[in-house]
Amino acid sequence: MIPGGGQPNMQQLLQQAQKMQQDLANAQEELARTEVEGQAGGGLVKATVTGSGELRALVIDPKAVDPEDTETLADLVVAAVQAANENAQALQQQKLGPLAQGLGGGGIPGLPF
């Protein structure tokens, strides 16, 4: 046994882990509320997703709509959503990365790093 008892250190570690867990939960809630945008075709198609990757809005400029070429429009939509999701992942890394490192670094299920 450690002189002076080992329990205060264990208690301190437990409190630290609980604080990190709470900080992580708070960051995840903030991500779910934060919206980021991606665009394609020079802004003709814009997608908005939450920081957790949920698609919230899609705006298509009428100039992007060509009844004879729906394939290009579909490609622009996919590209805009992908760009928005990349921005959401960058935000996740920014918000959650430091917290994950505090928990022993990466490898946490459900986190993209």
Curated annotation (Swiss-Prot):
GO MF term (any one): DNA binding
Keyword Membrane: no
One GO cellular component, as annotated: cytosol
InterPro entries: YbaB-like_sf, YbaB/EbfC
Keyword list, A-Z: Cytoplasm, DNA-binding
Family named by the database record: Belongs to the YbaB/EbfC family.
Name the UniProt record assigns to this protein: Nucleoid-associated protein SAV_4556
